[in-house]
A protein has these predicted regions:
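Glycine-rich phosphate-binding loops of nucleotide-dependent enzymes
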Residues: 1-163
Length: 163
């Protein structure tokens, strides 16, 4: 499946035309297809993957596959997007690229991002507000600066001496 086809699957929940209309490619189905393709092309342009839009996703390196995953999610035009470990397995350059895109998602698409991430540098750089959990209990909540200086967070993540 190509990058474009993969991103287009993110639009499936937005399709309203019936089976017959789609099969005959008439009227409403044709208009929907054009509109959906335009939305997907906008997302592809935003994530700077135009040059690989016809490439099978299976041939892409890991970092680009993660970008395609983000593109597919954005194609559905969510109001809230939950990203669970979006930087997992990425090298430094890939993390920088993904961070840049995540920072711009709200401005470009009006989508709020809820991020679950263990790379605290990424969390502090990307977040307006941070909530820190330790074994299922909330131990910190505030701006990155407030959380960075929260003693409970410091103890949980750096350890505390029990002498």
């Amino acid at each position: 499946m190509s990058v474009l086809d993969n991103v287009m699957t993110g639009r499936l929940t937005q399709m309203n035309s019936g089976f017959i209309s789609q099969a005959l490619w008439r009227g409403k189905a044709e208009r929907e297809e054009i509109e959906n393709r335009e939305i997907c092309e906008r997302v592809i342009d935003f994530l700077e993957i135009q040059s690989i839009r016809k490439t099978p996703v299976s041939r892409l390196p890991y970092g680009l596959k993660k970008r395609v995953e983000l593109a597919r999610a954005l194609a559905s035009e969510p109001k809230l997007l939950l990203l669970d470990e979006p930087m997992a397995g990425m090298n430094v350059e890939e993390k920088e690229d993904m961070s840049r895109f995540i920072l711009d998602v709200n401005d470009e698409f009006g989508t709020t991002i809820a991020l679950i991430e263990h790379d605290m540098g990424v969390v502090m750089d990307l977040s307006d507000r941070v909530v820190v959990m330790d074994y299922g209990k909330k131990i910190g909540d505030g701006t990155p600066s407030e959380v960075r200086n929260n003693q409970a967070v410091i103890d949980a993540y750096l350890g505390v001496s029990h002498d």
